[in-house]
């Protein structure tokens, strides 16, 4: 009789859960874990196509959403993930704009646009969206366009955006999120296996990244019934005991 028991070699390495926990705490990925979207080589090399195609796809919605905000003279605005600066022309010149992005190549393009347009009210700098190097309540308005589904930790990024926004300030997001329609959601989940290698996610749930933030929802809508994009405009609550978004709806 052949035994069904297979003995493991004494030299076989066993997985140590303590090691896994330490690796997770220090950001060490296992061999099977895919790199974060923004670290994708394809993502870094797609800048020419980004500048050619992306304006046709998204610029109109971004510009309209910025121009829908009441922006007072002297207000401080932070754009997280400014990229090559395709959104910068939509901001009024009477405000002070700071743009941050991880890609220094994209920021070089943004600086070219700033110099060519002689914009003295705009400054861009390299920075991680998940670790914004600004004090709490530094800005009156914080914006981000099609970035939250690109970063490693979307919830962390949104938390940082809320932190640097002053109480009573506004947060504006344009992004695609997982559809509430089950059929479309399944398609997006399948597509995510491919899009992650191109630098973005299609399975990100809106509630997962904003429901615990101290924000009051002002507007949440799609530009058209068939649009893949969602536009969110919210106000930072000042009272730490105030209801969260999920409770304020």
What is each residue range found by the language model?
Residues 130-141:
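A short acidic, Gly/Pro-enriched loop at the edge of an enzyme's catalytic core
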């Amino acid at each position: 009789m052949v035994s069904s028991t297979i003995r493991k070699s004494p030299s076989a390495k066993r997985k140590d859960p303590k090691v896994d926990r330490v690796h997770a705490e220090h950001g060490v990925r296992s061999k099977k874990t895919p790199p974060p979207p923004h670290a994708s080589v394809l993502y870094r090399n797609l800048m020419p196509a980004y500048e050619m195609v992306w304006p046709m796809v998204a610029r109109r919605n971004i510009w309209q959403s910025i121009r829908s905000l009441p922006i007072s003279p002297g207000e401080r605005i932070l754009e997280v993930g400014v990229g090559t600066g395709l959104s910068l022309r939509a901001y009024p010149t009477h405000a002070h704009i700071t743009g941050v992005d991880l890609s220094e190549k994209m920021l070089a393009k943004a600086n070219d646009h700033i110099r060519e347009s002689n914009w003295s009210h705009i400054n861009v700098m390299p920075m991680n969206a998940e670790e914004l190097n600004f004090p709490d309540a530094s800005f009156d308005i914080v914006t981000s366009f099609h970035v939250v589904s690109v970063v490693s930790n979307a919830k962390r990024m949104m938390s940082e955006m809320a932190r640097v926004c002053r109480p009573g300030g506004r947060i504006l997001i344009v992004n695609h999120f997982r559809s509430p329609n089950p059929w479309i959601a399944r398609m997006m989940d399948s597509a995510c296996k491919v899009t992650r290698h191109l630098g973005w996610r299609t399975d990100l749930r809106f509630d997962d990244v904003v429901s615990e933030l101290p924000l009051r929802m002002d507007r949440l809508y799609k530009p058209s019934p068939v649009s893949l994009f969602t536009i969110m405009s919210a106000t930072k609550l000042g009272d730490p005991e105030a209801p969260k978004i999920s409770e304020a709806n």
